[in-house]
């Protein structure tokens, strides 16, 4: 029997394991049976309560008006595991043809359901388009489709609760957020205003590292602060998408496999292949 070939040049990171499917929002979604009127009215009341509390928090801040939030973070909680949140309805942009599109509301992070907690999705709703977001739920109550079902049924029926967003909802690293230390703020790069960013960091006396990283559509800003100060950033116009624990690494190999993949995909998007017959230089280090 021939000897098995040596494949030392291949590295297998981890092994195959069975996991429940967590990606949802694409295609058909099982719809949770609920009482239409009771459920719809309760969700509208919860959304209104979050918006009202957010406005009270802004009014109590001693900040320049320019440093106050121009949108509200909401956390949508699912019900049973079988009825996933309709994630593809949680991002909507304006439909301008000649001017850049602006977000009406954006899906930021998703926490899959576990044995102890239901699925949670954190979104950001622009102040300018609050009324359109609430209209999704009002239409659910009053408008029927041609199939005699509530409009936006798959979206609204599968949301069990709507609540204010806290640090834990934006935190995507393992474990609990620290009380003090370094934090990686992931910002939506297209909406970052560098001057505004510097003013917010100065207003809350946050120490910024010299290291800034761009990956795909995200700008990662590393800051040193207490947990209390980080919580205040939710009430500012910074376009936060998630908050992570920083990775202090000496080399690319120190990154996790998923983090390496992010950097490789980002590099691939920025590299153009040379044409056939182009000069080739071999650099030996």
Predicted feature descriptions by range:
Residues 60-85, 171-189:
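Short glycine-/aliphatic-rich beta-strand segments at the starts of folded cytosolic domains
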Residues 82-95:
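Calcium-regulated, polybasic anionic-phospholipid
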């Amino acid at each position: 029997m021939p000897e098995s070939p040596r494949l030392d040049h291949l590295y297998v990171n981890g092994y195959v394991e069975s996991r429940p499917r967590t990606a949802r929002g694409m295609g058909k979604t099982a719809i949770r049976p609920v009482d239409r009127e009771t459920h719809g009215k309760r969700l509208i009341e919860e959304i209104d309560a979050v918006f009202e509390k957010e406005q009270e928090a802004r009014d109590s801040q001693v900040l320049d008006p320019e440093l106050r939030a121009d949108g509200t973070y909401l956390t949508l909680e699912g019900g049973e595991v079988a009825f996933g949140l309709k994630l593809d309805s949680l991002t909507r942009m304006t439909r301008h043809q000649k001017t850049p599109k602006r977000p009406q509301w954006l899906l930021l992070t998703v926490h899959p359901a576990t044995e102890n907690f239901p699925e949670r999705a954190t979104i950001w709703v622009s102040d300018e388009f609050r009324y359109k977001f609430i209209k999704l739920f009002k239409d659910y109550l009053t408008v029927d489709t041609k199939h005699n079902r509530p409009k936006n049924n798959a979206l609204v029926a599968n949301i069990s609760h709507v609540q204010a967003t806290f640090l834990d909802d934006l935190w995507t690293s393992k474990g609990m957020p620290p009380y003090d230390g370094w934090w990686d703020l992931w910002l939506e790069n297209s909406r970052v205003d560098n001057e505004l960013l510097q003013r917010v960091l100065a207003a809350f006396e946050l120490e910024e590292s010299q290291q800034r990283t761009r990956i795909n559509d995200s700008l990662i800003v590393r800051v040193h602060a207490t947990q209390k100060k980080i919580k205040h950033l939710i009430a500012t116009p910074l376009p936060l998408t998630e908050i992570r624990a920083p990775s202090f690494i000496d080399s690319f190999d120190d990154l996790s496999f998923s983090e390496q993949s992010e950097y490789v995909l980002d590099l691939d998007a920025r590299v153009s292949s040379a044409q056939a017959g182009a000069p080739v230089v071999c650099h030996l280090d």
